[in-house]
Amino acid sequence: AARRLGGADKPGLIVGGRTLLDRVLDAVAGAATIVVAGPRRDTARPVSWVREDPPGAGPVAGIAAGGGLVRADVTLVLAADLPGIGPAVPALLGAVSGSPAAGVACLVEASGQVNYLAAAWRTTALRAALELTAGTHGAPVRALVAASEMIEVPDPQGWGYDCDTWDELAGARERAER
């Protein structure tokens, strides 16, 4: 549950007639494997479900729980609260695939804020970073990124706009109506 949203079920919130989670799943529709960390729920697309250990341990624990199911060379790591992420997916994939030295490509907002949960990883780099943070309860995602060479993918369009507050959710709903 999202603390800044009063404990609301963030992935289940509706933007543009779809849940936040379904909007993110639409963005990765072509993926061979789609893994979602969190409690099971109905989704518009079939996914593999995993739970972080312990439940509620945070994004790194969720990423670790799902990482073993991925067989592709590149792994997208996307938060469930990114309703406009679809157009960013090719940019993220292209950035990490086009730079042999890079382990991860992350969206960077116009303000300069890096969105570590809007990222494309070389799967080998992600697994190595997860090994470095293993056993660290509540490790921040930036700790994973710090263990790898990162490419910044500018996001002037706001594709990585996330919904952490009610005002941000209202903004996402307004964007979806345009």
Predicted regions and their residues:
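Nucleotide and nucleotide-moiety/phosphate-recognizing core
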Residues: 1-138, 146-159, 166-170, 177
